[in-house]
């Protein structure tokens, strides 16, 4: 068992197509908990293509696309102006469009991508953050659907089979003084065993044991979680 504090960090995406696809792969692998297979030197095209074929297109929303067009390109501007997942800014001569790769893929607007993709200047900017927290907190956050969210998958992530050293990671509540670290039922580095924290610790140990037990008798990862 591993205990961790909540944390947040930004995933920075560059604006070229290869960067967009790489960013999507990183977000997807965070969901699949396969970040160890993420290779910054390898193209992400095939990974994203296979993800689209599997129907997991929600993660495409993390790929931010910036387009810059002349303000007389009415068809393009009208499309993105009426798209709920895009924003449009105009300074007279030029129009600055912020959208995401899912909009491009589902509407087959690849021509826009090839012709008008640009670095962000006067665009409305989008940001991606990796939030490490417990699932109860994350479910409060994802109620706000104006943003795009990808969570660690209960279906694909399997903590057994010697993956992640057979440890389930739990988040330390803000009200707890439990230190970060790796623990098990035999741990000697547990300073709170005779304190009020002991029930919390014992509950996590039992929870982790039950999770692996259910997997061992044939339950799916989703059922066990």
Show which residues each predicted segment covers.
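Family-specific signature for flavin-dependent thymidylate synthase
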Residues: 1-225
